[in-house]
């Protein structure tokens, strides 16, 4: 179910959360990937434009947290980031971006953005390791050090695969790795302690 358009388009009442000193929202919705651990494609469908950055920023802060699930997978998301790179807004894209979608042009745009702290990516499978190395190299070319990279590492039942991905990421000195246990509440799969 979706919210009625007039409700969905309402600007949040941040006065309800006085400790929240940032704007929060989506520029794109959905995702074209069909990752087995992710519910977004079923819930939101394929990726599509959703808002412009001007529709979600606040005039009392320069902090903007984006919750897009795959912002680099749509030209609208990339264009919004390009425009944001020309502003003083400090970004946090709190969902992981795809390492496979970092081109030289995208790396240049990301390097011009102001970041609250990290640039976040994910490495959920071995096939993404080479993509991570490529993305890190392109970002370094444009002045972004590995210390600005935050990598979500999906932790699965396959410890051998998990460790291979972890050790591969540790080759990129300075990156921050966050182990994210696999869970699928729809199937009753919860992380083991």
Describe these PLM feature segments.
Residues 1, 39-135, 146-156, 176-180:
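Core AdoMet radical
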Residues 1-24:
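Glycine-rich beta-alpha loop elements in corrinoid/cobalamin-binding modules
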Residues 5, 34, 44-46, 73-75, ...:
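Short catalytic/ligand-binding loop motif for oxyanion handling, primarily in non-cytosolic enzymes
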Residues 17-19, 29, 57-58:
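Short, flexible hinge/linker loops that cap or flank conserved catalytic cores
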Residues 21, 33, 129-132, 181-186:
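Extended, charge-rich low-complexity interaction segments
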Residues 26-42:
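Local cysteine-cluster metal-coordination motifs and their immediate loop/turn environment
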Residues 79, 83, 134-141, 163-171:
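Alpha-helical scaffolding segments of alpha/beta enzyme cores, especially the outer helices
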Residues 154-193:
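Auxiliary Fe-S-binding modules of radical SAM enzymes
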